[in-house]
Each structure stands twice: as C-alpha cells, then as structure tokens.
C-alpha cells in the first residue's frame, strides 16, 4: 500500500523509555537531540506536533543513582517526580537549540474522562498550538493511582498517546519503539519472523502475534501498542509503529517511506 501523509497537519509522536534511556541507565542524549531536531523541523514546516514522552522513572533512577525501580508505590512516585523535572529540563534545553518552545502537560485519566476537565485540556492544547509551542505530555505519575474506586492511571503511555491523539484531533500517531514494527511472530524468538508493513484491521491473528512485556525501565509491550492502534481506528485516524533508533526516520516516513507498520483502515 502506497503511503501518503501530505495531508498531515497535526501529529502526535510517542517515545518510550527504552528509546530515551540506555541499558546502562544513562540518558541517551544523542537520541533526544535528534528527536528535538526532527520535531523542530516539522514545526517549522507548519505541522503541529505533540510529543508524548515516557521516561520520568528512567530519568529519576539516573538522577538518584538507583539501579532498579523501587518496589514500593510511594517511592516509585517519588522517583518519577524527580525524573520528570530532569527530563523536562533536558527537553527545554535541547529544543531551545532549535529555537523551539516547549511546554509540559501532565495528565491523569480522570482529566480526560470528565467533560469539564477535558474541555480545559483541549483549550490548553489549542492555545499552545496558537502560541507556536510544542506540548510535551506525560502521565502525572507522582499522583496517579490504580485502584478500583478511583483509578486515575492510563496504564502506560502507549494508551495515553492514543488518547492524546483523539483529544487533539491528530491526523497521525507515530509510535517510536525498540522494535521495527509489528511482526507476524516474536522476532526475538523466531528468526523467520516477518514484519507487517500494513495492518488494515485488528484481527485475532494480529492480537495473537502481540505478546511480551516492556523493558526494565518502562511498562509498555506490544499488546499495549495493538490496543492503542484499536483506539486510533475507533477515532478514524492512523498510526505508524516504528523503531525509534533513528528519529530522523520520522521525516522519511512522512515522505512516504515504508518504514515500520502502518495501521490504517481501508478506505
């Protein structure tokens, strides 16, 4: 299927912790600089971009010199709180090199599930677009809870990115991962696994080919990405799942290059 993204005027890009934090726990400065360059280039072309960025926990572990995620929820929230500040500080610094202004929006599920707060969030996004600012979104990990009587967590930022794409009316969601796209089976296990270039619908076969958890720094696995694609389909939009190793590939994707997996319903 030929890809044409010429009509894309509003774009959501999601980047995961594994793309921002090296296996050693150090911050991937080169990757963040490339991402800022790409988003700034798109911004200069008149495309409105929202960046949904994981990484608060990974940055927090780095700042506090901790080797692994704490088991206690309170400490997890504290580490994420420290990491969010460090992450946004770096983003602000790097984007400023390209004369691009950024802002921080921290969301919880209850914000988008209640009409009044959702309207406020939409107004905030629209105002930022009008001001020429790139919103950087993350879940508010320091206060989010996952309890039956008051669940405020999205689950992971794959889902959050699909929700943000719906909230802002994005023409396209690009999800950067540590894998090249959706394969017919797990490429880490099967050498003959084949990359699916195009997925027009989420079938039982597609669901069966997704499995496994995320990295030690993040939470998202392939199943969460498939569920995000389902949400994108429900909103009559489209999504590209691609490897985040080289953020400049985003520019090639928007030019029509067949990189990663395109989730788009047939016309």
Swiss-Prot record:
Keywords: Amino-acid biosynthesis, ATP-binding, Cytoplasm, Kinase, Nucleotide-binding, Proline biosynthesis, Transferase. One of its GO terms (molecular function) is glutamate 5-kinase activity. Substrate binds at residues 54, 141, 157. GO terms for biological process: L-proline biosynthetic process. It is found in: Cytoplasm. ATP binds at residues 14, 177-178, 219-225. It catalyses: L-glutamate + ATP = L-glutamyl 5-phosphate + ADP. Its main location: cytoplasm. NCBIfam families: proB. Catalyzes the transfer of a phosphate group to glutamate to form L-glutamate 5-phosphate. Belongs to the glutamate 5-kinase family. This is Glutamate 5-kinase. It comes from Streptococcus thermophilus. The gene is proB.
């Amino acid at each position: 299927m030929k890809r044409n993204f010429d009509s894309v005027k509003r774009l959501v890009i999601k980047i995961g912790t594994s793309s921002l934090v090296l296996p050693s726990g150090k911050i991937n400065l080169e990757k963040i600089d490339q991402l800022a360059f790409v988003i700034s280039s798109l911004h200069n072309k008149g495309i409105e971009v929202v960046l949904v960025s994981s990484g608060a926990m990974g940055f927090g572990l780095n700042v506090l010199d901790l080797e692994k995620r704490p088991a206690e929820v309170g400490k997890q929230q504290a580490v994420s709180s420290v990491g969010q500040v460090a992450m946004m500080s770096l983003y602000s610094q790097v984007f400023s090199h390209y004369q691009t202004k950024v802002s921080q929006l921290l969301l919880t599920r209850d914000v988008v599930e209640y009409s009044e707060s959702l309207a406020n969030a939409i107004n905030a996004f629209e105002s930022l677009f009008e001001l020429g600012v790139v919103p950087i979104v993350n879940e508010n990990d320091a206060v989010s809870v996952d309890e039956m009587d008051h669940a405020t967590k999205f689950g992971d930022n794959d889902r959050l990115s699909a929700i943000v794409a719906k909230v802002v009316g994005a023409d396209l969601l690009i999800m950067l991962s540590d894998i090249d796209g959706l394969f017919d089976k797990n490429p880490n296990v099967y050498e003959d696994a084949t990359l699916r270039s195009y997925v027009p619908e989420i079938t039982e076969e597609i669901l069966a080919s997704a499995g496994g958890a995320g990295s030690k720094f993040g939470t998202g696995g392939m199943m969460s990405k498939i569920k995000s694609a389902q949400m994108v389909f429900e909103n009559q939009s489209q999504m590209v799942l691609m490897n985040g190793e080289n953020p400049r590939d985003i520019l090639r994707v928007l030019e029509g290059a067949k990189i990663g997996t395109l989730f788009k319903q047939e016309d």
